Amino acid sequence: MARSVWKGPFVEESLIKKVEKQKLDPKKMPIKTWSRKSTIIPEFIGVSFLIYNGKKFIPVTISEDMVGHKLGEFSPTRTFFGHTPAEKKGKPAEKKK
């Protein structure tokens, strides 16, 4: 079920404070976050984040197209190695009579 409109998007309070603090700082270091569930709001545009995927931090810079999505959508947690090609698969078992 979708979140109620009257509640507004969920954004971790500490994340908002860090973004406001970074906008005043001239160094522009990426913000390290574990909050994959936070929604990207327009104030985040142009800010760099390091989003934790369960193993390492993935660098992401927020653009206009990302507004409204969750931070976790841009930090995949699983590695896809592809499907096994047909020639590498074993031969099917022969039926016994």
Swiss-Prot record:
PROSITE patterns xrefs: RIBOSOMAL_S19
Listed transmembrane segments: none
UniProt GO MF annotations: rRNA binding; structural constituent of ribosome
Single Gene Ontology BP annotation: translation
GO cellular component, one term: small ribosomal subunit
S-S bonds: none
UniProt signal peptide: none
Gene3D superfamilies recorded: 30s Ribosomal Protein S19, Chain A (3.30.860.10)
Matching SUPFAM superfamilies: Ribosomal protein S19
Keywords: Ribonucleoprotein, Ribosomal protein, RNA-binding, rRNA-binding
Similarity-based family: Belongs to the universal ribosomal protein uS19 family.
NCBIfam families per record: rpsS_bact (TIGR01050)
HAMAP family on file: Ribosomal_uS19
Function: Protein S19 forms a complex with S13 that binds strongly to the 16S ribosomal RNA.
Name the record gives this protein: Small ribosomal subunit protein uS19
Organism for this UniProt entry: Pelagibacter ubique (strain HTCC1062)
Lineage start: Bacteria, Pseudomonadati, Pseudomonadota, Alphaproteobacteria, Candidatus Pelagibacterales
Gene: rpsS
